[in-house]
Swiss-Prot record:
Residues 391-393 are annotated as: Docks into pockets in the proteasome alpha-ring to cause gate opening. It is found in: Cytoplasm. ATP binds at residues 178-183, 317. This is Proteasome-activating nucleotidase. SMART domains: AAA. It comes from Saccharolobus islandicus (strain L.S.2.15 / Lassen #1). One of its GO terms (molecular function) is ATP hydrolysis activity. NCBIfam families: PRK03992.1, proteasome-activating nucleotidase. Keywords: ATP-binding, Chaperone, Coiled coil, Cytoplasm, Nucleotide-binding, Proteasome. Belongs to the AAA ATPase family. Consists of three main regions, an N-terminal coiled-coil domain that may assist in substrate recognition, an interdomain involved in PAN hexamerization, and a C-terminal ATPase domain of the AAA type.
Length: 393
């Protein structure tokens, strides 16, 4: 009989232990839930504070007074003399800096980041160009001149300070289309480890009055902040053509943009870590003000490649391709007289397509010769179309 009581007592005690464990687990889960709810409550409190807090007023610093107060031009209208909050670093308060004011006491509570126009921001090449001088054929003299003007002042400015001369501020590359002007600019940016800012001059021609000049100004400001940097202005004749008085609003806006570009070229130090490279196919129509000393001092012609240059360019492109061993570079160069570097690249691509159509994985000499013939026919057709257009226009 006593054994039965012992069994019942043992069973009840084990149930109690199990119940205690369940209650402990329940308490732990409730504690976790309470902690999550507390975090959620704090989050919503912070969001409520954000929504109920009054908006700040944007202003631009005009001057810093001797007593530490600041003269600002507020976006709401008047100029104000305001104090600076204690948590703001006084070194950040400079003329031209954007700040945020509270609405009650007009105290500077925050220094706003530098504003950048989206159009200007997209001009910057974030990744460094991967073009090297070894990928450019037949332009040894042009590379030498470009390195002297752009790369040397960026890497060793002390040489020019010691001698007492200022290097050219800008370089103008001119020549027929497809001769490698853009590749030269990218190569010098690669070798000098500089930020490459590529812009086509037609992007400066904006719809509204003053927009083009503002973009030019902000472009140069960004280049100074990102220094060392290289600004490459392609097709500069789009805004740099000779000024003529035809009276249209569009022409006047382009002239204002050109004048802003000239002012920016005049306004920076040649030994600063910013260099300007411009390119054009039509140097004959450029405004003389662009070409005068002190702006684009070094003017470099990038001509069509000669026999040796074409041989080098063919060698550069064919080294990257699967070709047969019997390729005669001299013959290819002879057959492609008058071709630019871009034309030679097209020849190599066209030859590769011919091999692909025939189911081969190697390019033959015949493919290259046929490709030259095909490109030549296209070039002749384009020239004849141009002649007919000029005749009947």
């Amino acid at each position: 009989m006593s054994g039965d009581f012992d069994t019942i007592r043992d069973a009840s005690s084990s149930d109690e232990v199990q119940l205690v464990r369940l209650l402990e687990e329940k308490i732990k889960s409730l504690q976790i839930e309470i902690e999550n709810l507390r975090k959620e409550l704090n989050y919503y409190k912070a969001e409520m504070e954000k929504m109920l807090s009054p908006p700040l007023i944007e202003a631009v610093v005009l001057d810093v007074l001797p007593d530490g107060r600041v003269l600002v031009r507020s976006s709401s209208g008047p100029n104000l003399v305001v104090n600076v909050a204690s948590h703001i670093d006084q070194k950040l308060i400079k003329p031209g800096v954007s700040v945020a004011l509270n609405q009650r006491g007009s105290t500077i509570l925050e220094v706003l980041p530098q504003k950048e126009d989206p159009i200007v921001k997209t001009m910057e090449i974030v990744e460094k160009p991967n073009v090297t001088y070894s990928e450019i054929g037949g332009l040894e003299e042009q590379i030498k001149e470009l390195r002297e003007v752009v790369e040397l002042p960026l890497k060793k400015p002390e040489i020019f300070r010691e001698i007492g001369v200022e290097p050219p501020k800008g370089v103008l590359l001119y020549g027929p289309p497809g001769t490698g002007k853009t590749m030269l600019a990218k190569a010098v940016a690669t070798e000098s480890n500089a930020v490459f800012i590529h812009v086509v001059a037609s992007e400066f021609a904006q719809k509204f009055v003053g927009e083009g000049a503002r973009i030019v100004r902000e472009l140069f400001e960004m280049a100074k902040r990102k220094a060392p940097s290289i600004i490459f202005i392609d097709e500069i004749d789009a805004i740099g053509a000779k000024r003529i008085d035809i009276g249209t609003s569009g022409e006047r806006e382009i002239q204002r943009t050109l004048m802003q570009l000239l002012a920016e070229l005049d306004g920076f130090n040649p030994l600063d870590n910013v260099k300007i490279i411009a390119a054009t196919n039509r140097i004959d129509i450029l405004d003389p003000a662009l070409l005068r000393p002190g702006r684009f001092d070094r003017i470099i012609e990038v001509p069509l490649p000669d026999f040796r240059g074409r041989t080098e360019i063919f060698n550069i492109y064919l080294k990257k391709m699967k070709v047969e061993d019997n390729i005669n570079l001299e013959l290819l160069s002879q057959l492609s007289e008058g071709f630019s570097g871009a034309d030679i690249k097209n020849v190599c691509v066209e030859a590769a397509y011919m091999a692909i159509r025939d189911g081969r994985n190697k390019v033959t000499m015949k493919d290259l010769v046929d490709a030259i013939t095909k490109i030549n026919v296209k070039r002749n057709n384009m020239e004849s179309m141009k002649e007919r257009r000029e005749k009947y226009s």
